[in-house]
Amino acid sequence: MCSLEKRDRLFILKLTGDGEHRLNPTLLDSLRSTINQIRSDPSFSQSVLITTSDGKFFSNGYDLALAESNPSLSVVMDAKLRSLVADLISLPMPTIAAVTGHASAAGCILAMSHDYVLMRRDRGFLYMSELDIELIVPAWFMAVIRGKIGSPAARRDVMLTAAKVTADVGVKMGIVDSAYGSAAETVEAAIKLGEEIVQRGGDGHVYGKMRESLLREVLIHTIGEYESGSSVVRSTGSKL
């Protein structure tokens, strides 16, 4: 599932175990519960969230085998991930994804839903695989892609050629902020970046509101109509 460690003002959320970290209802509920736990901490608005993982996968996307065995669960998983992404966007603190393995499809969307993406260069790629497996991408995935990938050419390559984007290529495309030689170096760099952000100070609530406005299209697709200045904390559980 996932674990949470607090180091001073840093919250380190880790997807644990050596599996593929498929986004099934249980894991998604665990991630949302952990985000809610962070929100309840008295220091949360002066903190930084770092999300990383064990093993060779950051996340290999939705649990497609589970969805095939029970098609109704595909709708449940999509709704739960939409709510998780909205949680991250509304979280009143900066967020960093330390991508130490493959991040595919919904797993790629999860990584890109963070403010910063740091990635190891010796293993792993960002991969929107839907074209290759002949699945139509949900409209809200496209909203995330538009909000997070500025270059039309990069969006084309990611979505319409199903490019497997390594860390160094991701830096050139503007998707990845920086690349590192190993998983350990990637996490260390994320911690260093988080500490630098904390040292700069700032009000997490103001930061979160600015992020909500910046990613307004994503919020409209994930939680419905959104008005700048309104709070999106968090009634979306009723939609699942």
Swiss-Prot record:
Keywords carried by this UniProt record = Fatty acid metabolism, Isomerase, Lipid metabolism, Peroxisome
**Which Gene3D superfamilies does the protein's record reference?**
2-enoyl-CoA Hydratase, Chain A, domain 1
User: Might you give the EC number(s) for this enzyme?
Assistant: 5.3.3.8
This protein's source sits in the domain of life called Eukaryota
Any one annotated GO CC term: peroxisome
Pathway involvement of the protein, from the record = Lipid metabolism; fatty acid beta-oxidation
Q: Name one GO molecular function term.
A: delta(3)-delta(2)-enoyl-CoA isomerase activity
Q: A Pfam family in this protein?
A: ECH_1
Biological process, per Gene Ontology: fatty acid beta-oxidation; fatty acid catabolic process
List the ranges annotated as motif Microbody targeting signal: 238-240
Q: Which SUPFAM superfamilies match?
A: ClpP/crotonase
Q: Where in the cell is it found?
A: Peroxisome
> Site (Important for catalytic activity): which residue positions?
130
In which family does this protein belong, per the annotation?
A: Belongs to the enoyl-CoA hydratase/isomerase family.
**Primary role:** Able to isomerize both 3-cis and 3-trans double bonds into the 2-trans form in a range of enoyl-CoA species. Essential for the beta oxidation of unsaturated fatty acids.
Specify the protein name.
Enoyl-CoA delta isomerase 1, peroxisomal
Which lineage? Eukaryota, Viridiplantae, Streptophyta, Embryophyta, Tracheophyta
Q: Which gene encodes it?
A: ECI1
